[in-house]
Design a protein with these regions (language model features):
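Generic structural concept
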Residues: 69-72, 134-137, 204, 231-234, ...
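Intracellular effector-coupling site of seven-transmembrane GPCRs
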Residues: 224-258, 328, 333-335
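Divalent metal-binding acidic/histidine catalytic loops
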Residues: 234, 256-267, 275, 279, ...
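Short intracellular "coupling" helices and adjacent cytoplasmic loop segments at the cytosolic face
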Residues: 81-86, 91, 103-107, 213-227, ...
Length: 353
């Protein structure tokens, strides 16, 4: 089947292509067919049965915490993909904007900009691939662990009323289904985290481009047309971060609350478990939570700091004693806008103007 223009633009944009290709395979974005339901519906049904098992196991603190971790993880995966599919037009429009801006930056004949774009693209791609690899490895640990734990156990706790889950052949069938559903579950969860990090890194590219253009003014001289272009670029970055916020704000909020609670519960569990194998697997769960938190907040904080640094660069680039009043006003506008940092927030925030 020939690719549409939208598919070609998004699948060939290096900074986002790793995650878009995963979403495209499962028909979450760009391609819209029944493939998406092969993952969302079975994984969603399994998640409901996992929450039902929490009710059954209530009172057994170790079992509840471990099963709650998986239930929350898969709930977040289903939530992410449901929002992605329901708002696919907004996500596709945002990704097309990234592809357009990326192409424009590629066409700038400036070695510094090309080097900057290449460096952050490589970083975004490595992060996306590493996240997928880490997700695949830890998911494999999830499904393999019960085989070495002794006795019959499922990778994820489930409760089906009236069904003996550990009898034959129910146990073998459910174990096989959980192993199969782990792969789409991983693909539903991991790419969204990498998408967030890649978009934040691309925001950093745009911010650093503005800083570079301001530094060049000291060498090339202040020109009204150049300052107007920088002001437009700054507004474009402000709009970009606002659009990113509109797509990920509530997902980030759910992640923050659910993973914050699960991190506390798992740290408590480390103090009461007795077997070394359980200690290792719980430590792996904690590591996965911390890695997701890192991907969200480290790059978000870097974007915030660099956006505020625009004011310092603009102030240092301007020869204030020699400038005309009209040029001073333009530089002051850039400085004033940069006083309000660009942030990816867990709550709605008004856009800078």
């Amino acid at each position: 089947m020939p690719q549409t223009a939208l598919e070609q633009h998004l699948l060939n944009c290096p900074i986002i292509s790793v995650n878009v290709r995963v979403w495209h395979f499962w028909s979450f974005l760009v391609k819209h067919d029944a493939m998406r339901y092969i993952s969302i519906i079975p994984v969603g049904a399994m998640t409901l049965l996992m929450f039902a098992d929490l009710y059954r196991a209530w009172g057994n603190i170790e079992e509840v915490i471990i099963n709650a971790y998986f239930a929350v993880l898969y709930f977040n995966a289903v939530l992410r993909c449901s929002i992605l599919v329901l708002n696919h037009d907004k996500y596709e429009k945002f990704l097309m904007n990234i592809a357009r801006i990326y192409k424009n930056l590629q066409q700038i004949e400036d070695h510094e900009i090309k080097s900057l774009l290449q460096r952050y693209t490589k970083r975004a791609r490595m992060l996306s691939i590493a996240n997928l690899g880490l997700g695949a490895f830890i998911s494999t640990c999830f499904v393999v662990y019960p085989l070495f734990a002794g006795g019959r156990g499922l990778p994820y706790g489930m409760y089906i009323p009236g069904v003996n889950l550990f009898g034959t052949p129910q146990y073998e069938i459910l174990f096989f289904l959980q192993v199969i559903l782990t792969f789409p579950g991983c693909c539903m969860y991991i790419p969204f985290t990498s998408f967030f990090a890649s978009c934040t890194l691309f925001g950093l590219v745009q911010v650093k481009n503005i800083q570079h253009q301001l530094r060049k003014l000291r060498i090339e001289g202040l020109k009204p047309s150049k300052l107007i272009e920088i002001i437009k670029d700054h507004q474009r970055v402000i709009d970009y971060v606002h659009d990113l916020n509109s797509l990920v704000t509530y997902i980030c909020l759910v992640e923050f609350l659910s993973f914050g609670m699960m991190l506390c519960a798992l740290l408590f569990l480390l103090n009461i478990i007795e077997h070394q194998a359980q200690f290792v697997i719980v430590a792996a769960y904690i590591f996965m939570i911390i890695s997701q938190i890192y991907a969200f907040y480290w790059h978000g904080n870097e974007l915030r700091e660099q956006s505020m640094a625009i004011a310092k660069v603009a102030y240092g680039a301007a020869p204030w004693l020699e400038m005309k009043p009209a040029l001073k006003k333009m530089v002051l506008l850039i400085i004033l806008r940069a006083q309000r940092p660009l942030e990816v927030c867990e709550t709605k925030k008004k856009k800078n103007r």
